[in-house]
Regions:
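Compositionally biased, disordered extreme N-termini, encompassing classical targeting presequences
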Residues: 1-5, 82-85
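Generic recognition of short, well-ordered alpha-helical segments
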Residues: 19-22, 49, 69
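Thiol-based oxidoreductase modules, predominantly thioredoxin-like and allied folds used
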Residues: 33-44
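Short Fe-S-cluster ligation motifs
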Residues: 42-55
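A short, hydrophobic beta-strand/beta-hairpin element that forms part of a small beta-sheet core
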Residues: 55-63
């Protein structure tokens, strides 16, 4: 079972979100890491918190990047063990 470690927060029609999604898909696939995508348009709380900074990537629930996702930086973050619940 793959553990979800990456959350990508964005919205449809956002070209930076499309770019971020491509990086997340690539890195997650390489490392066998699960990821989910959420839209600020579907959740008022997400929109209030992140709406001006999309796309946002969270790793293990913590903000990792916004606007642009660096593949090398994402790989480095995912090379560290996930925190225990």
């Amino acid at each position: 079972m793959t553990t979800t470690r990456i959350t990508l927060i964005g919205r449809p029609g956002c070209h930076l979100c499309d770019d971020a999604r491509a990086v997340v898909e690539q890195v997650a696939g390489e490392l066998g890491v699960g990821w989910v995508e959420q839209s600020v348009d579907d959740d008022p709380a997400l929109r209030a918190q992140w709406g001006d900074h999309i796309p946002v990537t969270l790793v293990d629930g913590r903000q990792h990047d916004f606007y642009r996702v660096s593949p090398d930086r994402l790989r480095a973050a995912l090379s560290r063990p996930a925190p225990r619940p």
